């Protein structure tokens, strides 16, 4: 109901804090697909604050990382989560995909993570 009352006003930007917190996978997916549709059909920019790194990888094309009041980077989620110079000071956990890429000797771990996510998006 709350988001519907906001959408009536046709905002240019929606700022959402943990929009999928506490949701099961089905509801999580419904919420995110709904937000994706709003973005694509109405051109609404959606800014999400999240601690769910998989959600960030799956549904966003840009990540802004702030730690201790400082902007650390603006980049793709895959690059953010595979760059130890960003993850460490931002207290972010690198993904298991990154760890697998490192253990398998894949040089471009960022590209590996991005390709996996692209595949996952395609089959969803």
Regions flagged by a language model, labelled:
Residues 70-97:
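Conserved beta-strand-loop-alpha-helix hinge in the C-terminal portion
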Residues 14-17:
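Catalytic Walker B motif of ABC-type/P-loop ATPase nucleotide-binding domains
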Residues 29-41:
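Helical segment within the ABC ATPase nucleotide-binding domain
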Residues 56-58:
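A short, surface-exposed alpha-helical micro-motif characterized by mixed small hydrophobic
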Residues 87-124:
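ABC ATPase nucleotide-binding domains
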Residues 8-12:
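A short, proline-enriched helix->beta-strand linker immediately N-terminal to the Walker B motif
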Residues 50-51:
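H-loop/switch region of ABC-family ATPase nucleotide-binding domains
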């Amino acid at each position: 109901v709350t988001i519907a009352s906001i959408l009536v006003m046709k905002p240019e930007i929606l700022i959402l804090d943990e929009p999928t917190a506490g949701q099961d996978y089905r509801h999580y997916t419904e919420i995110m697909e709904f937000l994706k549709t709003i973005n694509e059909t109405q051109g609404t920019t959606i800014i999400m604050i999240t601690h769910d790194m998989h959600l960030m990888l799956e549904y966003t094309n840009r990540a802004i990382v702030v730690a201790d009041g400082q902007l650390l980077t603006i980049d793709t989620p895959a690059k953010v989560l595979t760059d130890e110079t960003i993850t460490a000071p931002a207290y972010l956990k690198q993904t298991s995909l990154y760890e697998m890429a490192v253990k398998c000797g894949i040089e471009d771990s960022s590209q590996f993570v991005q390709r996996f996510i692209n595949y996952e998006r395609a089959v969803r």
